[in-house]
Amino acid sequence: MPSTGDDDVLEALASLPTMAHPTFSPDGNEVALYYDVTGRNELHVLDTETGELEQWSDGEVPRNARWFVKWGADGDRVFFHLDDDGDEQNDIYAIDRDGSVEPVVEMDGQCMLTSVAEDGSRLVFGSSRDGQMNVYSYDFESGETTKLTDYERAVWGAHLSPDGEHLAYATNETDDFDNQDAYIADADGSNPRNLELGEVGAECGPADWSPDGDRLLVSDNTPDLGRAGVYDLGTDEVRWLGDGEYDESGVSFVDETRVLASRDRDAVTMLVVYDLETGDGRELDLPEGVASTGMWFSAPVIADGRVVLQHTTPTRRPELVAYDLADDEYETLLEAEYGPFEPDDFADAEYFTVESDGVPETAQHAVEHDPYDELEIGALLYDSGERPSPLIVNPHGGPMARDSKSFDLYTQVLAMRGYSVLQVNYRGSTGRGREFKEELLDDWGGAEQGDVATAAEHVLDERDWLDDDRVVVFGGSYGGYSAYWQSVQYPDLYDASVAWIGLTDLEDMYENTMPHYKTELMEKFLGMPEENPDRYEERSPVTYAENVDAPLLILHGVNDRRVPVSQARIFREALENAGYEAGEDGDFEYEELGAEGHASSDQKQKLRMFRLLDDFLDRRIGRGRP
């Protein structure tokens, strides 16, 4: 392993090859995926029988592997999304086996490919061309693009049935912003029908068509914990699966008699196979971690009948696995690369819970909250092994997400540099059901931030090997919002802060983010600024910029369209107006990341981020490991 005291370890970690978005060919003999084993993200195709990995692209696909790929119906080309240096204003391109690339759909806004007709005649995709994310089709013979839906709220997951006659998707036509319903329409978008599978206010959506197209696998959280079910188009009835003990969602049909579901418990995500004749289900026999099959509506079954999935743990990087449901045996199709490292070199995750009423012992400086309901909050602690160890509090993004027992490269970078890392699944996180997730509605900057601070207080009290004079908050996206908020709400707790692609001015965010983020994020959680101006101002970190009382590093991609770079610039201006000085010896530091949007998987861009983060922490609080 490289020395942990120089730049070699950062470069070695940033250079670890990463696979993304495995997608299965129509005949089940190949898997297309993004892989950066060459040092740059490229499209590769894996032969599942021989294990041969062939590189199709040579710089034509995006550097950042954020967006998924889909096979063409003939199995001789793959569709991918292409943007401009991470701005996510995707067009849809195709690449064939000899590396030839051509544009297929070029439109304003963001395009999101969701379905390829099995006869190869057309594509179905989402686009924000006209404002909101709606569904469109592209006809290969005529070259024409047709708008299929025109909803005020975003439409998600549109997918053609196997016979090409129907379209399944999810949207919301009710006045309840928390609601989502599953719909079926004719393939041209006509005759849309709400299946009305869940109660108003719950979230329901399609996951996969059955091979014969007569049934639809759906997910719904009406009972609180999510559940998977199979809807029969002929009888207009749904059969729900599972006993309701865990938060679950539908993944895909395996065949006509079995489906896969995803199950969240504590900080792990496991796959469950359900027998549709008996209703019995069992978890796949894999080590506890995170197992996933990739994009929805992409059956993960290869030609020999095995299920292909990605599996990872805190110390084992993602690998591609073929799992035999008949005997619960599995083999690795594509092993993870470790470079100069071994799995034992990485820090493992300890899962624990803490009781929180959303109000920590640390003084509240921005908004004074009364105690909320006391809830059990889950968290993960990564021990760097350094004694004493500085602590990095690392709230997740989303906010509709959670931290789990998977390999996290940023966490391992910090741990190898001697910083222990705390991740907190605050109220509002996923994996705990609808009620827990909805705790965050109308309360950004409230109890969820108190949960983060309470968990930090807990580990500092319980682990005497943590150095309470070297505590830093670091987060990206909504985690960046949390980093800003922690620094202005609980400045006494932290010795430095790092806010990456974070929100600072909620009204500016509302005005300048993409349309589907405006409705499905900002309006859903906070309402509209003109209807709720006080809340928008009160919960914006920039309102309290003068509360920053420790060195702050601000990082933001210049091409970010989810959280525009204006968010960082506004906070910088507020600090300067309050008399704060910028620079390595100043009160705050500021970096705009060129040719980058809302984070990046590109190896060079990751290394840039690692160096900025490592240098700031070393200068400002002292590296955990010299």
Sequence positions of predicted segments:
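Short, Asp-centered acidic motifs that coordinate Mg2+ and/or phosphate
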Residues: 390-391, 420, 472, 496
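Conserved alpha/beta-hydrolase
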Residues: 418-433
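Sequence/structural signature of beta-propeller modules
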Residues: 1-11
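Peripheral, non-catalytic segments that deliver or gate enzyme domains
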Residues: 10-20, 26, 30, 34-67, ...
